[in-house]
Amino acid sequence: MEYKGKVVAGLLTATCVFSIIALILSAVDVKDVFLPPGTKYGLVFDAGSTHTALYVYQWPADKENGTGIVSQVESCTVNGSGISSYADDPAGAGASLKPCLDKAMAVIPVEQQWQTPTYLGATAGMRLLREQNSTKAEQVFAEVSKAIREFPVDFRGAQILTGNEEGSFGWITVNYLLETLIKFSFAGKWEHPQNTEVLGALDLGGASTQITFQPGVTIEDKNTSVLFRLYGTNYSLYTHSYLCYGQIQASKRLMAALHQDGSYVQNISHPCYPKGYRRIITIAEIYDSPCVPTPSMLSPAQILTVTGTGNPAACPTAILKLFNLTCGANRTCGFDGVYQPPVRGQFFAFAGFYYTFSFLNLTGQQSLSHVNATVWDFCNKNWSELVETFPQNKEHLHTYCVVGLYILTLLVDGYKFDEHTWSNIHFSQKAGNADIGWTLGFMLNLTNMIPTEALEHVKGHEPSLWAGAISFIVLAIVAGLVAILLQCFWKSK
C-alpha cells in the first residue's frame, strides 16, 4: 500500500477508535437528573380603607409539603385613597391601579405573565361601603376588575375579605417571615422548626383591628376559630376582627361622642388634641360611615369648630367609652362581648400599631409604664411646641396623641395585655425584606390550591465523563477531517 493510503487508513482507524471511546464514555454511569424548578409569580392588591398597594410574589414551581416557598419581589403603593373612596367615581378606582400594574409587568417575564394569578382583596373600607351602599360597592369592584383584565394576567377575581380572613392571613405572614412555620436547615433542606412557638398577630387598620394567636386552651366559640394546613402541619387559631375599631373610624366615633356629649353645640373641646390646636370641619366629615350614623336633626353641611385642650387624663376616659367591656358569665372576653381566650406567647403588632409607636420612639420593647409616660408627655405638649419640634409632620401631628392613647386602651383594656405580657409585643413594619400584612399570608395559603409542577426529568453524566466524551468526539472529528483532506488533496507521486 502506498504511503498516502497508509496515512489515510491510520487516520480512519483513529477516528473509529475515538468514536467508540466517546460512545462508551457517554453510555456509562448515566444518572437521572431533575432540572431546577421554574419560578411562578403572583399578584395581590391590598385594597385597604386608606390606600391600596400591589405586591408581587414569586415561588418555585415545585412546593414544600404542598405550600410554596414565597418571597416578595416588588411592591407598589397606588396613588390616592382606598378604592372605597371612589364610590361616586368607580372608573377612577380602576384607573388608579394601572401604574402599579405597569410596574409589575416590568418585573414578571413576558412569557409568564398570562399564567400569573392575580387577586384583589378589599378589607374594612369596602366592608363599610357594602353596608352603606351595596350597589356602589359592586360598581367599584366592576371597574377595578375591568382595569386589571386589560393586562395579560390570570385575574382570579376581586373580593371583600372577611375580618377573620384578614387577621389569619396576617398571622401566616408574620410566622412565615419569622421562620416559625418552615426554615432552611444546615442540611440544605426546608424543614418544620422543632420546639418553636408560633407568634400572635395584632393588626390595626383605618377601619378595623384584628387579633390572631394560638391559645393554650380549647377555643370555646367556633366563630372565632380557624384551621390552616401549611407545610404539612395543622394550626388551630383564635382570630377576631373588630369593625369600626380601626384608628380612623375610632377617631371619628370619638369625635361624634364628644359632639353628642356637648349637646351638639358647634364648638367641640377635644381632650386628645394638643392645646392650641384648632380645626374647622363639617358634620359630614364625622358622620360619614355606618360606624358613625348621622343623627336625623343634623345637616351634613353644618360647620363645627374643634379645639384641642391637651388633657391626657380626660382623653383615655373618653376613649374607654367607645368600648363595651361587659362580658357574659363563665367566659373570658376581649370587648363588645366577644369571646377571647387569654393572650399567650409573643405577638407582632404591625400597620397602625407600628406607625404611631414608631413616631413616638416606642418600638424598642419598652415597659408598659414607660410607654404610658411617653404618650402622656407627648399629649401634654401644646400645638406650637409640637409644630416647632416636628415641622415635617404637621399634617398628622395632631393625631399622634389620640391614636397613641387609643392603642394603649385597645391593647390593655380591649385585648387584655398587662404589665407582664406587654413585653411580649413587638412593634414592626417589616420582617426580612417583606412587608407585614395579610397579602403574603393570602398568597401562601393560595399556593396550597395551585397545582405543583412536576420537575423536568433528564439523563445526565458526571462532568468529568462528559468532558472526556466530548474530547474524544472532537478528536474523532479532527482525525476524520484530516483523512478526508489528505484523500482529496494529497497527490500520489
From Swiss-Prot:
InterPro entries: GDA1_CD39_NTPase. Its EC number is 3.6.1.5. The keyword Cell membrane applies. Keywords: ATP-binding, Calcium, Cell membrane, Disulfide bond, Glycoprotein, Hydrolase, Magnesium, Membrane, Metal-binding, Nucleotide-binding, Transmembrane, Transmembrane helix. Glycans are attached at N65, N79, N133, N223, N234, N267, N324, N330, N361, N372, N382, N445. Its cofactor is Ca(2+); Mg(2+). One of its GO terms (molecular function) is GDP phosphatase activity. GO terms for cellular component: plasma membrane. This is Ectonucleoside triphosphate diphosphohydrolase 8. It is found in: Cell membrane. Its main location: membrane. Residues 1-7, 487-493 are cytoplasmic. It is a multi-pass membrane protein. Disulfide bonds join C76-C100, C244-C291, C327-C333, C379-C401. Canalicular ectonucleoside NTPDase responsible for the main hepatic NTPDase activity. Ectonucleoside ATPases catalyze the hydrolysis of gamma- and beta-phosphate residues of nucleotides, playing a central role in concentration of extracellular nucleotides. One of its GO terms (biological process) is nucleoside diphosphate catabolic process. It catalyses: a ribonucleoside 5'-triphosphate + 2 H2O = a ribonucleoside 5'-phosphate + 2 phosphate + 2 H(+). The keyword Transcription does not apply. The active site is at E166. It comes from Gallus gallus (Chicken). N-glycosylated. Residues 29-463 are extracellular. The chain crosses the membrane at residues 8-28, 464-486. Ca(2+) or Mg(2+). Has lower efficiency with Mg(2+). Belongs to the GDA1/CD39 NTPase family. It comes from the Eukaryota.
